Amino acid sequence: MNRRYALVLSLAALFTDFALANRSFAQAKSLKDQLVGTWIYISSTGKREDGSDVQRPSLQGAVTYTADGRFHFITTRTDNPKYASNETTRPSPEEAMAVASGSIAYTGTYVVDENTKTIHLNIETSTFPNLVGAPNQRRIITSVAVDEMKFTNPRTPAGVTLEFAWRRAK
Protein backbone atom coordinates (compact mmCIF):
# COMPACT_ATOMS: atom_id res chain seq x y z
CA MET A 1 0.00 0.00 0.00
CA ASN A 2 2.80 2.41 0.86
CA ARG A 3 4.47 1.73 -2.51
CA ARG A 4 1.31 2.61 -4.40
CA TYR A 5 0.86 5.76 -2.36
CA ALA A 6 4.49 6.78 -3.00
CA LEU A 7 4.10 6.05 -6.72
CA VAL A 8 0.91 8.12 -6.94
CA LEU A 9 2.56 11.02 -5.09
CA SER A 10 5.63 10.84 -7.35
CA LEU A 11 3.50 10.84 -10.51
CA ALA A 12 1.39 13.72 -9.19
CA ALA A 13 4.54 15.73 -8.45
CA LEU A 14 5.94 14.95 -11.90
CA PHE A 15 2.75 16.04 -13.67
CA THR A 16 2.53 19.20 -11.55
CA ASP A 17 6.14 20.14 -12.42
CA PHE A 18 5.44 19.48 -16.10
CA ALA A 19 2.25 21.56 -16.07
CA LEU A 20 3.95 24.47 -14.29
CA ALA A 21 6.91 24.38 -16.66
CA ASN A 22 4.60 24.47 -19.68
CA ARG A 23 2.59 27.32 -18.19
CA SER A 24 5.78 29.32 -17.54
CA PHE A 25 6.98 28.65 -21.07
CA ALA A 26 3.65 29.74 -22.53
CA GLN A 27 3.75 32.93 -20.48
CA ALA A 28 7.29 33.87 -21.58
CA LYS A 29 7.41 37.39 -22.99
CA SER A 30 8.28 37.96 -26.61
CA LEU A 31 11.49 39.84 -27.33
CA LYS A 32 9.45 42.86 -28.41
CA ASP A 33 7.51 42.80 -25.13
CA GLN A 34 10.80 42.67 -23.21
CA LEU A 35 12.08 45.74 -25.08
CA VAL A 36 9.04 47.95 -24.48
CA GLY A 37 9.90 50.79 -22.14
CA THR A 38 12.64 53.34 -21.65
CA TRP A 39 16.29 52.35 -21.32
CA ILE A 40 19.04 54.61 -19.96
CA TYR A 41 22.50 54.60 -21.55
CA ILE A 42 25.23 52.83 -19.53
CA SER A 43 28.14 52.47 -21.96
CA SER A 44 29.23 51.75 -25.50
CA THR A 45 32.25 50.40 -27.33
CA GLY A 46 33.23 50.70 -30.96
CA LYS A 47 35.32 48.64 -33.38
CA ARG A 48 36.50 49.36 -36.90
CA GLU A 49 36.39 46.71 -39.63
CA ASP A 50 40.07 45.92 -38.99
CA GLY A 51 39.23 45.11 -35.34
CA SER A 52 40.85 48.21 -33.85
CA ASP A 53 39.02 50.00 -31.05
CA VAL A 54 37.29 53.33 -31.57
CA GLN A 55 37.61 55.78 -28.71
CA ARG A 56 34.10 56.53 -27.42
CA PRO A 57 33.26 59.81 -25.65
CA SER A 58 31.52 59.99 -22.30
CA LEU A 59 27.82 59.88 -23.22
CA GLN A 60 24.39 60.07 -21.67
CA GLY A 61 21.15 59.14 -23.33
CA ALA A 62 18.09 56.97 -23.60
CA VAL A 63 16.16 54.78 -25.99
CA THR A 64 12.42 54.13 -25.76
CA TYR A 65 10.43 51.37 -27.48
CA THR A 66 6.63 51.58 -27.40
CA ALA A 67 4.21 48.67 -27.63
CA ASP A 68 2.74 50.10 -30.85
CA GLY A 69 6.10 49.92 -32.68
CA ARG A 70 7.57 53.40 -32.26
CA PHE A 71 11.02 54.24 -30.91
CA HIS A 72 13.05 57.29 -29.85
CA PHE A 73 16.85 57.31 -29.45
CA ILE A 74 19.19 60.02 -28.17
CA THR A 75 22.78 60.15 -26.99
CA THR A 76 24.78 63.27 -26.27
CA ARG A 77 28.24 63.93 -24.91
CA THR A 78 28.35 64.66 -21.20
CA ASP A 79 30.84 67.46 -21.86
CA ASN A 80 28.77 69.39 -24.43
CA PRO A 81 29.31 73.12 -23.85
CA LYS A 82 26.57 75.38 -22.57
CA TYR A 83 25.70 78.20 -24.95
CA ALA A 84 27.15 81.52 -23.78
CA SER A 85 24.12 83.30 -25.31
CA ASN A 86 21.75 81.08 -23.29
CA GLU A 87 19.56 80.89 -26.44
CA THR A 88 19.06 77.66 -28.39
CA THR A 89 19.09 79.53 -31.71
CA ARG A 90 22.27 81.55 -31.08
CA PRO A 91 25.23 79.28 -30.34
CA SER A 92 28.72 80.32 -31.32
CA PRO A 93 30.14 78.37 -34.29
CA GLU A 94 32.32 76.36 -31.87
CA GLU A 95 29.38 75.57 -29.58
CA ALA A 96 27.21 74.53 -32.54
CA MET A 97 29.94 72.26 -33.92
CA ALA A 98 30.56 70.62 -30.52
CA VAL A 99 26.87 69.89 -29.97
CA ALA A 100 26.24 68.73 -33.56
CA SER A 101 29.22 66.37 -33.53
CA GLY A 102 28.56 65.12 -30.00
CA SER A 103 24.85 64.34 -30.19
CA ILE A 104 22.59 62.07 -32.19
CA ALA A 105 18.83 61.68 -31.96
CA TYR A 106 16.41 59.84 -34.18
CA THR A 107 12.89 58.47 -34.07
CA GLY A 108 10.59 56.34 -36.15
CA THR A 109 9.07 52.88 -36.22
CA TYR A 110 10.54 49.48 -35.47
CA VAL A 111 9.82 45.79 -36.03
CA VAL A 112 11.42 42.95 -34.08
CA ASP A 113 12.49 39.72 -35.79
CA GLU A 114 12.19 37.25 -32.91
CA ASN A 115 14.19 34.54 -34.72
CA THR A 116 17.29 36.64 -35.45
CA LYS A 117 16.89 38.90 -32.38
CA THR A 118 17.07 41.89 -34.68
CA ILE A 119 15.35 45.26 -34.36
CA HIS A 120 14.66 46.71 -37.83
CA LEU A 121 14.37 50.49 -37.74
CA ASN A 122 12.58 52.87 -40.07
CA ILE A 123 14.10 56.25 -39.18
CA GLU A 124 11.65 59.07 -39.90
CA THR A 125 13.46 62.02 -38.27
CA SER A 126 17.08 62.46 -37.20
CA THR A 127 19.60 65.09 -36.19
CA PHE A 128 21.79 63.36 -38.81
CA PRO A 129 19.56 63.70 -41.92
CA ASN A 130 21.46 60.99 -43.83
CA LEU A 131 19.82 58.36 -41.57
CA VAL A 132 16.26 59.31 -42.58
CA GLY A 133 14.91 56.52 -44.76
CA ALA A 134 18.33 54.83 -44.94
CA PRO A 135 17.96 51.11 -45.73
CA ASN A 136 19.04 48.25 -43.49
CA GLN A 137 19.02 50.13 -40.19
CA ARG A 138 19.10 47.37 -37.61
CA ARG A 139 20.19 46.59 -34.09
CA ILE A 140 21.03 43.07 -33.00
CA ILE A 141 20.01 42.22 -29.44
CA THR A 142 22.90 40.46 -27.71
CA SER A 143 21.19 40.21 -24.32
CA VAL A 144 18.04 41.38 -22.60
CA ALA A 145 16.96 40.93 -19.00
CA VAL A 146 14.41 42.61 -16.77
CA ASP A 147 16.69 45.57 -16.06
CA GLU A 148 19.53 45.44 -18.61
CA MET A 149 19.78 45.25 -22.39
CA LYS A 150 22.67 45.15 -24.86
CA PHE A 151 22.52 45.57 -28.60
CA THR A 152 24.93 45.94 -31.48
CA ASN A 153 24.68 48.44 -34.30
CA PRO A 154 26.50 46.26 -36.84
CA ARG A 155 27.67 49.04 -39.12
CA THR A 156 27.37 52.78 -38.75
CA PRO A 157 27.72 55.12 -41.76
CA ALA A 158 31.38 55.50 -40.67
CA GLY A 159 31.91 51.72 -40.93
CA VAL A 160 32.11 51.18 -37.17
CA THR A 161 30.35 48.44 -35.17
CA LEU A 162 28.96 49.75 -31.89
CA GLU A 163 27.91 47.74 -28.82
CA PHE A 164 25.55 49.56 -26.43
CA ALA A 165 24.58 48.68 -22.85
CA TRP A 166 21.38 50.05 -21.30
CA ARG A 167 19.53 49.79 -17.97
CA ARG A 168 15.78 49.98 -17.69
CA ALA A 169 14.51 53.34 -16.43
CA LYS A 170 12.72 53.17 -13.11
Map each language-model feature to its residues:
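Lipid interaction determinants
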Residues: 11-170
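N-terminal export leaders
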Residues: 3-7
